Amino acid sequence: MLQNVLRHGLIGLFLITPALAAPTAEQRGKAFARANCARCHAIDRGSNSPLRIAPPLRTLHNRYPIEALEEALAEGISTGHPGMPAFELDPDQIHDLLSYLKTLE
């Protein structure tokens, strides 16, 4: 009886452990993009950007090597148009966002 309880308990533990795992860098990067970029940019592989002049994030690798964006993100992104806020990301945010952008290539 005790063995059955322990066996079922261990099986249950193994089943719920993935759900409790910490988010991956890609997941955190997507969450960052959703919170900070999606108002204007398409952040997935297929949709159009809500703001027509804002390039979809999935096309950034066509313009720049993704790794080359690291310095720009660290120094702060600023643009010539007033609608886009200036961004300066910390190293963890940069890693997460670049990890997510690589999934869109």
Mark where each language-model region is.
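His/Cys-centered metal/cofactor-coordination and adjacent catalytic loops
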Residues: 22, 47-60
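Electrostatic cytochrome c docking/interface patches
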Residues: 17-32
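The canonical Cys-X-X-Cys-His
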Residues: 34-43, 97
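Extracytoplasmic electron-transfer domains, predominantly the class I c-type cytochrome c fold
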Residues: 56-105
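Detector for the c-type heme attachment site
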Residues: 41-46, 62
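Disulfide-bonded cysteine motifs in exported proteins
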Residues: 4, 32-35
